Amino acid sequence: MEYRIEKDTMGEVKVPADRYWAAQTERSRNNFRIGPEASMPVEIIEAFAYLKKAAAFANAELGALTTEKRDLIAMVCDEILANKLADEFPLVIWQTGSGTQSNMNLNEVIANRAHVLQGGALGEKSIIHPNDDVNKSQSSNDTYPTAMHIAAYKKVVEVTIPAIERLQKTFAIKSEAFKDVVKIGRTHLMDATPLTLGQEFSAYAAQLQFGLLALKNTLPHLAQLALGGTAVGTGLNTPKGYDVKVAEYIAQFTQLPFITAENKFEALATHDAIIETHGALKQIAMSLFKIANDIRLLASGPRSGIGEILIPENEPGSSIMPGKVNPTQCEAMTMVAAQVLGNDTTISFAGSQGHFQLNVFKPVMAANFLQSAQLLADVCISFDEHCASGIEPNYPRIQQQLENSLMLVTALNTHIGYENAAKIAKTAHKNGTTLKEEAINLGLVTAEQFDQWVRPQNMVGSLK
């Protein structure tokens, strides 16, 4: 491999000759050989491109940067956003907790690429300086948290929310389709009074609806950007009005409602907005866990389980048991939920580590957040496509379970009293007989009264 010599304030560094990065990026590559290379999320790189372009425009408008340099920086940022420079960002998550080296990776690549676009060669002194121009009016301490918010907001709004809404809509449709299917309810995993399958599915739709509401309610905080706070939140070395102006440009370029942070000190020292939004993602993950568990239990069998619903048969389920089919989409969903719960633990702890004016767990928070947001989106689409949309009632099994339930006796409470109703249920269970048989044998009701009072379809109420 051929190398060229790049310099920073610590001296000379050998850099691969054909790469646009420079000394500080190469030092980080050599110093942090931890985990897979280039593990810094691409969403963070893209977010940096948006903010570097916005900073160039804001600085130029405020007289701190020439329009020539602005246009060169913007041109390279557009190339990054078009995925033309993907191989130029080799750094890992496991680096400085402020993300300084990734910030410099962007600065160096933009400066060197701009020089080449001007007809220069790598290794020559560039017309664009990585610190003085690309990083003008910025610090890693305000750029990385800004990139975190841009990446997180975009992912949640453009990817996660639409996917959850899709699955929520399917459950709402199923709830309406199953509104007349009366089945036995279960509490404590034991038989309970009847409800409709539609009512059961309405709970799933409502869970996701509330989860979406919680998620959307976190977005105003996430939309606040730290950029303009520079090193500790004071805005040192920025032109007047820069913080507001740069946020306006980011909003313009992303077409998302970003604004400057109300308090830059909070925006640098803490990442409560990330914790808050991920908390809503965790809420949704726990809802999905519950839903997936219910569905795989309701579909259990096919002959020796509950078996009240039929789910799509997507692939063989066993390498040894012929004909076995498993609830694989439910299993995938529960594993995703477990991962999100683990990510939330990491994010919550990392968020507590804001010592004085700076939190230094930024990259791991960003990576875990983005993984959760993407996984939840992917699993909602997968579950909707390969499971939820194909769920159908198993009518014979539902009727069999309903007729066999002792908890239908609850309908007699208001006619013969709780204790007499309990006596009927216990006697029927002990003798292996029906509720009707024992109610008549015990002389507590007539056959006509039993048929009039114990009607499952009248026990489901009017709530939907």
Swiss-Prot record:
The record marks E331 as: Important for catalytic activity. Pathway: Carbohydrate metabolism; tricarboxylic acid cycle; (S)-malate from fumarate: step 1/1. This is Fumarate hydratase class II. Its EC number is 4.2.1.2. GO terms for biological process: fumarate metabolic process; malate metabolic process; tricarboxylic acid cycle. Belongs to the class-II fumarase/aspartase family. Fumarase subfamily. It comes from the Bacteria. It is found in: Cytoplasm. Its main location: cytoplasm. The keyword Cytoplasm applies. Keywords: Cytoplasm, Lyase, Tricarboxylic acid cycle. The active site is at H188, S318. NCBIfam families: fumC_II, PRK12273.1. GO terms for molecular function: fumarate hydratase activity. One of its GO terms (cellular component) is cytoplasm. There are 2 substrate-binding sites: the catalytic A site, and the non-catalytic B site that may play a role in the transfer of substrate or product between the active site and the solvent. Alternatively, the B site may bind allosteric effectors. Substrate binds at residues 98-100, 129-132, 139-141, 187, 319, 324-326. It comes from Haemophilus ducreyi (strain 35000HP / ATCC 700724). It is an enzyme of class 4 (lyase). It catalyses: (S)-malate = fumarate + H2O. Homotetramer. Involved in the TCA cycle. Catalyzes the stereospecific interconversion of fumarate to L-malate.
